Swiss-Prot record:
Protein name: Lysosomal aspartic protease
Protein family per UniProt: Belongs to the peptidase A1 family.
Enzyme kind, highest EC tier: hydrolase
Main location: other
Length: 387
């Protein structure tokens, strides 16, 4: 009887794993390695998290650092796209076949052709998002979206007609798939993740990110819809309640570098898969960059001596009473430039005033070391040590 029970439990575990929807993530050279301009990124983060009339998702400029993308399809038969899965916005958009032939960014990426899809439904509502280099604009359409082997039917998304700025040209991905709360969805569109759950494609309204930090690995990581993969992390999750259902925002206890403590008495933080950096208030980040021996170079960037990485101080983020540590190798970015490798700090200063700020933004520098679970059913974010 005991053996039968064990077998049954094993079978249930296998079935639970099978119910996950998995999308492989690929890692590419970030567009920021072509256009390194932290000042531009700071402007975009301000727009993203400091909108005058409430949260407004911003689609691209702080994706200068987005290195991880995955494959989706839209339409019947399926048309393929590479998208960044972004927890800091809630809409899905891809370039449209109807974009102007003078739009270089559009020409260089995969484009959705409504005329070639038998499941296309016209919507036509105007769509636009304002950011530093101009406005991404287009219109809404509805079609079937495929990802991880499942099909999300009647999904409304944006066809982008105008994609301004060189960032679009350099990007290795075609569009963005937002995974934030519906409250920040432009035009009130129901996000893809919501429809996945509502249509019974996943058992639980949970998704999780595993980012492979091994540069020699074939795959960049994985996003799992429906739960978390226990093979990708060790120990238990530390859960933090979402205190603002827009972005994945929560309370952080403190940030520590040696005996120096920042974010005193607690502060607000956001887990954002749309950027690889960690951002925080300018005065505090400046102090952190000095503490790690960073040398200011240009546009808010700090260079670090690559040979000193093993000796750099541990930086600890205290979340839910537990310390999540980053070593020098975790928070220093190696960038190839003119045939040489330079090392840049993964910390960026940005001041976001009240009521939305001040904020810390934990991007891929943090998520790469700590497997991250986004649990919309319980309105919480969980962190565990990635394998």
């Amino acid at each position: 009887m005991l053996i039968k029970s064990i077998i049954a439990l094993v079978c249930l575990a296998v079935l639970a794993q099978a119910d996950f929807v998995r999308v492989q993530l690929h890692k590419t050279e970030s567009a920021r390695q072509h256009f390194r301009n932290v000042d531009t990124e700071i402007k975009q983060l301000r727009l993203k998290y400091n909108a005058v009339s409430g949260p407004v998702p911003e689609p691209l400029s702080n994706y200068l650092d987005a290195q991880y993308y995955g494959a989706i399809t839209i339409g019947t038969p399926p048309q393929s796209f590479k998208v960044v899965f972004d927890t800091g916005s809630s809409n899905l958009w891809v370039p449209s076949k109807e974009c102007s032939f003078t739009n270089i960014a559009c020409l260089m990426h995969n484009k959705y052709n409504a005329k070639k899809s038998s499941t296309f439904e016209k919507n036509g509502t105007a769509f636009h998002i304002q950011y530093g280099s101009g406005s991404l604009s287009g219109y809404l359409s509805t079609d079937t979206v495929g990802l991880g082997g499942v099909s999300v039917t009647k999904q409304t998304f944006a066809e982008a007609i105008n994609e301004p700025g060189l960032v679009f040209v350099a990007a290795k991905f075609d569009g963005i798939l937002g995974l934030g709360y519906s409250s920040i969805s432009v035009d009130g569109v129901v996000p893809v993740f919501y429809n996945m759950f509502n249509q019974g494609l996943i058992d639980a309204p949970v998704f999780s990110f595993y980012l492979n930090r091994d540069p020699s690995a074939a795959e960049g990581g994985e996003i799992i819809f429906g739960g978390s993969d226990s093979n990708k992390y060790t120990g238990d999750f530390t859960y933090l309640s979402v205190d603002r259902k827009a972005y994945w925002q929560f309370k952080m206890d403190s940030v520590k570098v040696g005996d120096t403590e920042f974010c005193n008495n607690g502060c607000e933080a956001i887990a954002d898969t749309g950027t690889s950096l960690i951002a925080g208030p300018v005065s505090e980040v400046t102090a952190i960059n000095k503490a790690i021996g960073g040398t200011p170079i240009m546009n808010g960037e700090y260079m670090v001596d690559c040979s000193l990485i093993p000796k750099l101080p541990k930086i600890s983020f205290v979340l839910g009473g537990k310390s999540f540590d980053l070593e020098g190798a975790d928070y220093v970015l190696r960038v190839a430039q003119m045939g040489k490798t330079i090392c840049l700090s993964g910390f960026m200063g940005i001041d976001i005033p009240p009521p939305n700020g001040p904020l810390w933004i934990l991007g891929d520098v943090f998520i790469g070391k700590y497997y991250t679970e986004f649990d919309m059913g319980n309105d919480r974010v969980g962190f565990a040590t990635a394998v």
